[in-house]
Amino acid sequence: MIFKSVRELNHHIKSNCVFISFGSKGTTYYEKTSNKVIKIFDMALNDSDYEYFEYKEIDFSRFKSAKNSTYLFPIDVIYLKDRVIGYSSELAKGSSLYRTNPLSINLDSLRSAFIKTLLDVKTISNNGILTDDLPYNTIYYPKGKKLYIVDTDDYSFSEMDSSLLYASNNRQIGNSLKMFLVDGYFDDVVSSNKYLYDLYKNGDFLTFLREYRKILSEIVSREVITLKDASGCVDKENRGNYVRLLK
């Protein structure tokens, strides 16, 4: 997609796009005509800033060999004349974790969704890709028991052994989910149990989830299926560090 001027770009956005979010590097929109997401690097539109913020098409094409359904990598590049100013990617179903109430989560479904990601974690790791910044870029689609990772353009390539890279990428997505399930809600439960706290800080996600659920179930004297079943354990005084935008 090539735009001849900023005016043409702005007209396209106003006529065909819906605002989704903005971050430190750009603004994300839903493009109705293509049913895709586009991200525009706002700094790339400014001549004086561009020299410090230059992307090239090759920066995005390198992800194409890592075909998967979890990490939504750039598909097509967006140009302003000959300058790369953004990209398009597939639209993820579901809702961002930071917009999702953790009490509503069925833990069995989330476990299944995480297990589904493991093959894709292996795929990107075998392609040398190191992930980054997952807590606010993870989307959960409960109906399909599926996780998606968005805003992937800033991922790097690593010379790390693929098994070590897999462990790192696996840990990143697991830590993101642990934070979502605990922070600002069940901090007291986790911090008061040394075994559980160690799993929260250093353990793999599936082991943590199993023990977390077991301990919550013991506290409330019934099986915890959704975290709402353990809502009596919520620490109402602790707002946590994970910023949530809940309705």
Language-model features and meaning:
Residues M1-C17:
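A short, low-complexity linker immediately N-terminal to eukaryotic Hanks-type protein kinase catalytic domains
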Residues I13-V77, T100-L103:
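ATP-binding glycine-rich loop module of kinase domains
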Residues K36, T70, Y87, Y148-D151, ...:
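Protein kinase-like catalytic core scaffold
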Residues L45, S96, F157-E159:
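Conserved protein kinase catalytic core
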Residues S48-S61, R111-L119, Y166-G174:
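Well-ordered, non-membrane alpha-helical segments in soluble/globular domains
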Residues S69-F114:
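Conserved structural core of kinase catalytic domains
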Residues T100-Y141:
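Conserved kinase catalytic-core helix
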Residues Y141-K247:
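C-lobe/activation-segment region of protein kinase-like
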